[in-house]
């Protein structure tokens, strides 16, 4: 099996890279990841990297033929020719790769793993031309792939409505095995994780800095906002910008926070950051859009709010009742950890859709 991504999966510091690494870990043996990356070389025998000097669409497009050639050399003599295309980048890269692999390796089974409905995001944040091209190519990718997946039943319904294409469910999931949390709290802080370069994250981070934190620090002068993910250069008196951090550090930051606040107004797919927080036993405050597609055991917590005043009031209550709320969600984290276990989800997906390729399933 060949996995292909058009973004770096190492270091493992983004939601999409977390999902890919977890999926790869629990996929049956006989596998390799092919990626386009601008980051320094990592010694990993299971990773084939096509390097670019700088992460730009043009540089990626120019390197696609080389990436396809590397995949071809790997799959050509394989008994089980399976290509998983991780669709967490511009759809053009996925379309180009699928189109040519289908022609040079006709017996290769191509699985398109959709992380979101990209045309929705492009419609909101890109110009009209890019949106139309994206929608056309996304439709073609769903049509020509042998199997396409979605991350939630909500996305599944949307894709059928937009493209009249049936998809298989392969939820975003994580691997929390052997994760050790250090219970250490020096300051009180809220946390938001995600690159500022991604427009939905930018809007959420700006909302926290301009609408939420100025009100909260009137009652809690020492309260901080911790952000991770990189791309942010602004200064605020309450802000602690951690940039890109390791998964170990990230999970400790999430667990020890007063809460993770995710005021997303727009987005597609399911938020790995929220799945991680719920599975770690952290308190989550989110908009309806932020928590969309996630199967909740119960609410309050997590708290689902869509306007400024309720968000501020709820965070105030969380800070005042932290220990009580943490105790309440201690059992809930077991539910989320099992429900969104990549090991369980991958095993189930293969048994339902690829059992003819993998006898052990």
Predicted feature residues:
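N-terminal subdomain of nucleotide-sugar transferases
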Residues: 1-41, 78, 215
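Conserved catalytic-core segment of nucleotide-activated headgroup transferases in glycan assembly
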Residues: 19-20, 25-26, 175-178, 184-248, ...
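Membrane-proximal helix-turn-helix segments that form the acceptor-binding/catalytic region
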Residues: 72, 99-103, 112, 118, ...
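Acidic donor-binding loop of glycosyltransferase active sites
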Residues: 146, 255-269, 280-283
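Carbohydrate-associated surface elements
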Residues: 154, 170-173
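Short hydrophobic beta-strand element within catalytic cores of glycosyltransferases
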Residues: 273-276, 283-287
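Conserved acidic donor-binding segment of nucleotide-sugar-dependent glycosyltransferases
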Residues: 301-309, 317-323
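A charged, aromatic-enriched C-terminal amphipathic alpha-helix characteristic of glycosyltransferases
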Residues: 323-355
